[in-house]
C-alpha cells in the first residue's frame, strides 16, 4: 500500500535540470536584492537624510525669570528682545553644547563652553526675551541682537565683543548704543526721545531714527548711513569716519578733528559744520531747494 500520511508524501527527486533551475532562481533573487540595495544607496547619496534637529531646536526650555532688567553675555548667543507687558524667557539650543543661563541680581547672564558654536562659528543658542523694559544689554562675547516693541526708560546697549545689531521697530524714551568692539548695525525703525551712538571700536551700519535729539560720536573707525528726523543732530568725529546722513530737522551741528568723509543731505533750519581735522564734506544736497 502506498502511504497516505502527508508527512510521508513522496517527494520528486532533484534532477540535474531542477538543481540548475533553483541555482539560476537564487542567483536572480540575489541580483535583484543587490540592485535594489545599490539604488537605495544612490538615492540616499542624492537626497541625504536631514541631520537630527534640522530646522528645529534640539533643546527648548522656558525659564521662570521675573523682574530682570538686564542681559550680560560672555558666550555665543542670539538674543531676541521684545518689549512687552509680561516677562518671558525661552532658551533654544541647536548644538550639542549647552550655554549656561542664570538670573543674578536682576540680570540674565549667558556663558558658553569653548565648543559653544557650530563648525562655522554661528550662534547655536537663542534667547527669546519679553519684558516691560530692559535697562542694559551687555556683550563681551559674540551676540546677534534683535530688538523690538515699546518700552519706557533708557535702553543701554554696550558691546565689547562682536555684535550684529538689528532693530525692526523699537520705541523708548532713550537708546544708548556704545561700541568698544566690532559691531554691524541695521536699524530700520527707531522712535525715541534721545538716541546716542558712541563708537570707540569698529562700526558698520545703517540706521533710520526719529528722535528729539541724535548724538553721534566716533573715536574709532566707522562707516554709517543714517536717516534722521527730529529736532537736533550733533556729529563729532575724532577718529576715522565715513558718514552719509540725511536729515529732516531743526539743527545740524558737525565737528571733525580726525579723518572724515561726510555727506549731508535733506533739510535743516540751522547748520554749523567745522573742525580742525582732515575732512571731505559734501553738502550739495543739503537745503537744496
Put a short name on every predicted segment:
Residues 1-289:
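Intrinsically disordered, low-complexity terminal regions
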